[in-house]
Design a protein with these regions (language model features):
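Conserved glycine-rich cofactor-binding loop
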Residues: 11, 18-20
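Conserved glycine-rich Rossmann-like NAD(P)H-binding loop of the short-chain dehydrogenase/reductase
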Residues: 34-48
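The beta1-alpha1 cofactor-binding region of Rossmann-like NAD(H)/NADP(H)-dependent oxidoreductases
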Residues: 43-44, 64-75, 107
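Substrate-binding pocket helix/loop in short-chain dehydrogenase/reductase
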Residues: 101-102, 106-111
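Active-site helix of classical SDR
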Residues: 125, 162
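Residue(s) in the substrate-gating loop at a strand-loop-helix junction
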Residues: 146
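SDR active-site lid
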Residues: 178-250
Length: 283
């Protein structure tokens, strides 16, 4: 089925939809005809994306949510079901990047990274699933992992380990829903490099001083090699609609990383840092 057939109506909830991939997915779903609940920790960002959807004839509402607080996700789920009675698509997208050596990153930044990137996904699914299951209708849950879910990267340990966790959670959730015979599709979304604001300087609050230079390098790399955001999000929505478990913006890159990961696991040797990655971090 094509995306306009699957997501031509119904309600979608997208977390972290005020910027980056979340905003691109929200806009695409609005174009297709869904009512989009645009959630973000920033009211101004959520309202901006909501207005962008409405200007193009779509239907959307803005909602302020901090996904690191499970009570706010519980409240969001209750309010959405009270207002609309259904959710066809839940996109657990909210996430932050954290750069720096493990022992130099403050405890507060570690807690924020893991709470947003892991617990935000888990509690998003936990909060919405009871009512989705009760409806008995076909639905979709898309969790944002990353191609980093199949790699190891020093100075990005928090982000990388969180994406490994999201991938593992998505696999387990898929099996659990299959176990109970629920008509719910789970997707693990594996974006490659897209042109987003994830490496902007304001996102680095609480990181060690040395991380600023790394952020600048990643911004340059993204500007040069990143895929257009709207094109990447169009591919994501299209593959979710097709029922793919793994959803990839750049399949060849994903396949290369998976092959390298399999070789690493088979070897049972310690991980090694490639020369390109070393230059990116150390130069």
């Amino acid at each position: 089925l094509q995306d306009h057939q699957v997501f031509g109506d119904g309600v979608a909830v997208v977390t972290g939809a005020g910027a980056g991939i979340g905003s691109g997915i929200a806009r695409r779903l609005g174009e297709l005809g869904m009512h989009v609940v645009v959630t973000d920790i920033s009211v101004s960002r959520a309202e901006k994306v909501t207005e962008e959807i409405r200007v193009k004839g779509g239907s959307a509402q803005a909602q302020v949510v901090d996904v690191s607080k499970f009570a706010e996700l519980d409240q969001l789920a209750n309010e959405v079901f009270e207002q609309h009675g259904e959710v066809r698509l839940l996109v657990n997208n909210a996430g932050i990047e954290t750069l720096g050596l493990t022992w130099e990153i403050p405890a507060e930044r570690w807690e924020a990274t893991l709470n947003i990137n892991i617990h935000g996904v888990v509690h998003g699914a936990r909060a919405f699933l009871p009512n989705i299951l009760k409806s008995g209708k076909e639905a979709w849950i898309a969790n944002l992992a990353s191609i980093g879910a199949f790699a190891a990267m020093p100075t990005q340990a928090g982000y990388t380990m969180s994406k490994h966790a999201v991938e593992s959670f998505s696999e387990c959730l898929h099996l659990e829903l299959e176990l109970v015979g629920a008509p719910i599709h789970v997707c693990s979304v594996l974006p490659g490099m897209l042109k987003t604001s994830i490496f902007e300087e304001e996102g680095g609050a609480g990181e060690p001083d040395g991380a600023r230079r790394h952020r600048a390098k990643m911004r340059e790399l993204m500007a040069k090699h990143g895929m257009d955001l709207d094109e990447g999000c169009r591919r994501i929505v299209e593959q979710i609609a097709e029922g793919n478990f793994w959803v990839s913006t750049q399949p060849e890159m994903t396949a290369q990383l998976i092959e390298a990961r399999v070789e690493f696991l088979r070897s049972q040797l310690p991980p090694k840092l490639g020369e390109q990655a070393r230059q990116l971090i150390c130069d």
